[in-house]
Swiss-Prot record:
Protein name: Protein dcd1B
Main localization of the protein described in the UniProt heading: secreted
Subcellular localization, as worded in the UniProt entry: Secreted
Comp. bias regions, Low complexity: 475-500
Region span, Disordered: 464-500
Stored InterPro entries: C45_proenzyme-like, DCD1A/B-like
Length: 500
């Protein structure tokens, strides 16, 4: 990989003209980055009077919480698969056990069909999305040589460069997990690796809230993660809650709300800690890819850290890449913190710290006792919606009031989550899942954003205590044989013992 990196840079320096590879595709996407990948230039974020100062643009979520037991689908060596949610809002629940390679192998076995559907669609989408992205003002976040690399050599070359630059800083277990996923699904390892570099190039606008103690109705910690990454992408059809059950002495159980085949943590909860992320659009410092991708740092926080102090120590001492806001909550302290994180900066904000950048807060972002928050716009935001909603429910904040805040703010289009640390519950909503991508002019209006859909309750005590699958009756030594036979048709005894 280092030779690839050196070759690419040398080619750019001597200005060799190479025609970039153009893929054939039938996906027609109208990319409006202000309304999908980046929403910083929305009218609310620019100080427009389109918002009434006492009202929000959206509405509270109208649906009751979906709390039916998950439905068992299949099991294999080191993995179990369930599903939950109604027909238009379904989420897969994937339990993984064992070492990293074994977890990846189980992932690719149980979701082989979905992986082989999603990856080609996503890589085609990524080619279009990144080329469109570098035409926008937000491409200024990328190093100039990387933009030139994309223009001259294509998107895959840029993804390969990022993979090469981050490799030495990334623990091998992540690569081993991808290798297992590749071996069982049949998707080339390099393709899976490229997919995992996409968030290093194109970030999402999101919202983060932490509320605790006097701000919440029961004094417990609640945390919001609203992911705004647009609806015109194939991830919409493949939401997956991945529950990891590491081996003894390798951290604790944790979960990530993700998609089939993506193992990084953009949204995650372990009861010990909860994490979330948002792009730091106003950052004007140094960029680098010589570090560990933020979504792998967040996953390590979930697996290994028990407090905000431990999470901060990890972030401080890990080489970092891009500029993001992070939200970290901790059951140990019953508090949450916001962070500004980049290659050369780590700033920590609590409920008494002026945000962003330690500057005096704008009127639309007042400080609240026992609350930290940042909305989906470029910061400092002049949209009063989130502050108004939080102030109205302060001292009586619940998971439901935060769900309503997301609806009022219209944030969390791809997925939305509320972590309830005291009850050990997670509430999740995803965008409409039963309209197949690519969307047409007729079908796109049918795709509803997550914040408008029904939220699903996940009992994390049950999920984290889920027992591993039963061994196959014949005790075969062949992992391939075990995986294939169990995933295609699980025995009735296995189904009965694993159903909830």
């Amino acid at each position: 990989m280092n030779l690839i990196k050196l070759f690419i840079i040398c080619c750019l320096l001597i200005s060799i003209t190479v025609k970039s590879f153009e893929i054939e595709n039938d996906i027609d996407i109208d990319f409006e980055f202000d309304n999908s990948f980046d929403q910083s230039s929305s009218s609310a974020g620019s100080g427009s009077d389109s918002y009434d100062q006492d009202k929000c643009k959206g509405k509270p979520n109208p649906y009751p919480i979906f709390n039916k037991e998950p439905i068992f689908i299949a099991s294999t060596a080191n993995g179990k698969l369930y599903k939950t949610g109604d027909d238009s809002n379904q989420v897969s629940i994937l339990h993984l056990y064992g070492e990293a390679y074994e977890m990846g192998y189980a992932h690719g076995t149980l979701l082989k069909e979905q992986v082989n559907e999603l990856i080609p669609k996503f890589m085609e989408f990524a080619e279009i999305a990144i080329k469109e992205f570098i035409k926008t003002k937000f491409a200024l976040r990328l190093p100039e040589f990387l933009i030139k690399l994309i223009e001259e050599f294509g998107v895959n070359a840029a993804l390969d460069y990022v993979a090469s630059a981050t490799e030495q800083f990334t623990p091998k277990r992540f690569f081993n997990e991808l290798l297992g996923l590749s071996d069982s699904s049949g998707i080339p390892y390099q393709t899976l690796l490229r997919m995992h570099m996409f968030p290093e190039l194109v970030k999402a606008t999101c919202s983060i809230v932490g509320a605790w103690s006097e701000a919440t109705i029961n004094g417990g910690l609640l945390q919001v993660r609203a992911l705004d990454w647009g609806l015109e992408n194939p991830l919409v059809n493949y939401p997956t809650l991945i529950v990891y059950h590491p081996q003894e002495n390798d951290g604790g159980e944790f979960s990530i709300l993700s998609w089939t085949s993506f193992i990084g943590a953009l949204t995650g909860y372990s009861q010990r800690t909860g994490v979330c992320e948002k792009v730091w659009l106003s950052y004007n410092g140094t960029y680098t890819h010589n570090g560990m991708p933020f979504y792998f740092i967040l996953r390590d926080i979930l697996q290994y850290d028990n407090s905000i102090y431990e999470a901060l120590n990890r972030i401080y001492n890990t080489p970092r890449t891009c500029a993001v806001y992070l939200g970290v909550g901790s059951n140990e302290s019953n508090t949450a913190s916001l962070l500004e994180v980049s290659m050369d900066v780590v700033r920590v904000f609590d409920d008494e710290t002026p945000f962003p950048g330690f500057a005096p807060p704008v009127p639309e972002h007042p400080l609240f006792k026992d609350v930290v928050y940042v909305d989906k716009h470029s910061q400092p935001s002049t949209d009063p919606c989130m502050a108004n909603s939080l102030s109205q429910s302060w001292s009586e904040i619940t998971a439901q009031t935060l769900i309503n805040t997301m609806g009022q703010m219209e944030t969390g289009d791809l997925h939305s989550a509320v972590y309830d640390f005291k009850q050990n519950l997670v509430y999740v909503s995803v965008a409409t899942t039963n309209i197949p991508f690519p969307f047409t002019n007729e079908t796109l209006p049918l795709v509803s954003p997550a914040y408008k859909n029904q939220f699903i309750q996940f009992n994390m005590t049950k999920l984290f205590s889920e027992q591993p699958p039963l061994p196959p009756p014949n005790n075969s030594s062949s992992s391939d044989s075990n995986s294939n036979s169990n995933s295609d048709s699980s025995s009735s005894s296995d189904s009965n013992s694993n159903s909830n």
